[in-house]
Design a protein with these regions (language model features):
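N-terminal single-pass transmembrane signal-anchor helix
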Residues: 3-33
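Periplasmic/extracellular, small/polar-rich flexible segments of pilin-like filament-forming proteins
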Residues: 60-180
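Generic N-terminal leader/processing signal
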Residues: 1-5, 40, 173
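Membrane-proximal N-terminal amphipathic helix
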Residues: 37-67
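Extracellular/lumenal glycan-associated surfaces
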Residues: 34-37, 165
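Intrinsically disordered/low-complexity terminal segments and short unstructured peptides
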Residues: 9, 24, 37, 42, ...
């Protein structure tokens, strides 16, 4: 009776295949993480551009109708802390602007308890912030002059400054918003 030869992979061949799969997996994980970070940064840049656009349209709404409301406050928009705070809260929740890096909050909290209380049903933190306390992924609104964001000069005094942060809290871009 002739012997039947069974062909199979050797242990070395199997180990080489496992090693190749491991290397490809580690390359894939690194590439995926880079893709995620790039997408998150692009999201924050879009949040910044939308914040500027929506803020300007709220201000324009007041110019068209003095009886309207901007950021849930009466027109005209004023360069005051309550408008700054309410703009951040309103833009975050009315336009669904989120910081993609922010940790989740407990559902059912109130944003801005003083000037424009907003009950938050979801478990996320707004992506537009009022004043200091910036984090990567945030869009912040301040009133100029405000150290260290904008020094006192005729081009910025009495105006809002909208900024966005990334790469260990480095300002990536800004826009001065004039209400006139």
């Amino acid at each position: 009776m002739p012997k039947k030869i069974v062909k199979a992979f050797t242990l070395i061949e199997l180990l080489v295949v496992v090693a190749i799969i491991g290397v490809l997996t580690s390359i894939g994980v690194v590439a995926y993480n880079g893709f995620v970070k790039s997408a998150q940064k692009k999201t924050v840049e879009i949040n910044f551009n939308n914040t500027v656009k929506y803020m300007q349209s709220e201000i324009a709404k007041c110019k068209l109708d003095k009886d309207a409301k901007a950021f849930s406050l009466p027109c005209p928009v004023k360069v005051q802390s309550n408008y700054q705070e309410c703009a951040a809260v309103y833009l975050s929740w009315h336009y669904n602007i989120k910081n993609p890096l922010a940790t989740k909050e407990t559902a059912g909290w109130i944003a801005s308890k003083n000037n424009c209380p907003t009950f938050v049903y979801g478990d996320w933190r707004g992506g537009v912030r009022s004043g200091d306390g910036q984090r990567d992924g945030d869009v912040n609104i301040v009133i100029c002059p405000r150290n260290p964001y904008c020094s006192s000069n005729l081009d910025t005094d009495g105006k809002f400054k909208v900024m966005w942060w990334w790469d260990n809290i480095k300002m990536q871009g800004y826009k001065i918003i004039n209400i006139d």
